[in-house]
């Protein structure tokens, strides 16, 4: 019974994509793993802001996803996007993921997990539910894809949602 419940919960996490929840907002200002202040509100004025959450700094599937998206940046750049990566862990741990993946966008340490909790993405006291979030200009969630595993990353779904091929 426990195994069946676990499988059903996994499918629930895997296929809970495209949910809208206008009541939740991302913080307007955050600090990167390099100590830089980031005005997220300002970023949304000039581009579509996409938040990639990773389960933990040691999550290999999450790192693979960042590398996959990094290889597709020419396609994503067609629709004027910028990424932020939200991860549990210290600045040092999170920055190491940035260096390892060579993902060229800011990484946001969420050591206290307050942002993840506010977004409803807390898996446990040390981990975030891996997700992709597209923000509205007012920092609320426009689109969210929850869940990730070694055969399902969600980046294709994001690209389809953004419809970058039809941008002028």
Locate the predicted segments by residue.
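Short acidic-hydrophobic, aromatic-tinged amphipathic segments that line or gate anion-handling sites
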Residues: 106-110
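N-terminal "domain-start" segment that seeds a small globular fold
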Residues: 16-42, 64
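Structural microenvironment flanking redox-active thiols in thiol-disulfide oxidoreductases
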Residues: 63-102, 113-117
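Sec-dependent N-terminal signal peptides
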Residues: 4-13
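Thiol-/selenol-based redox modules, centered on thioredoxin-like
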Residues: 129-168
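Structural micro-motif
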Residues: 104-105, 123-133
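Short active-site neighborhood of thiol/selenol oxidoreductases, capturing the structured segment around
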Residues: 43-63, 67-69
């Amino acid at each position: 019974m426990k195994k069946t419940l676990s499988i059903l919960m996994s499918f629930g996490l895997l296929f809970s994509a495209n949910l809208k929840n206008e009541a939740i907002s991302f913080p307007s200002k955050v600090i990167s793993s390099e100590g830089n202040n980031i005005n997220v509100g300002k970023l949304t004025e000039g581009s579509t802001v996409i938040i990639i959450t990773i389960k933990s700094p040691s999550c290999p599937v999450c790192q693979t996803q960042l590398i996959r998206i990094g290889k597709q940046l020419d396609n994503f750049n067609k629709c004027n996007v910028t990424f932020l990566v939200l991860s549990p862990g210290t600045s040092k741990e999170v920055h190491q993921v940035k260096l390892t993946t060579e993902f060229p966008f800011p990484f946001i340490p969420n050591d206290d997990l307050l942002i993840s909790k506010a977004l409803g993405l807390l898996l446990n006291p040390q981990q975030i539910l891996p997700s992709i979030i597209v923000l509205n200009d007012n920092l609320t969630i426009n689109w969210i894809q929850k869940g990730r595993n070694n055969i399902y990353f969600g980046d294709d779904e994001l690209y389809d949602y953004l419809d970058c091929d039809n941008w002028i």
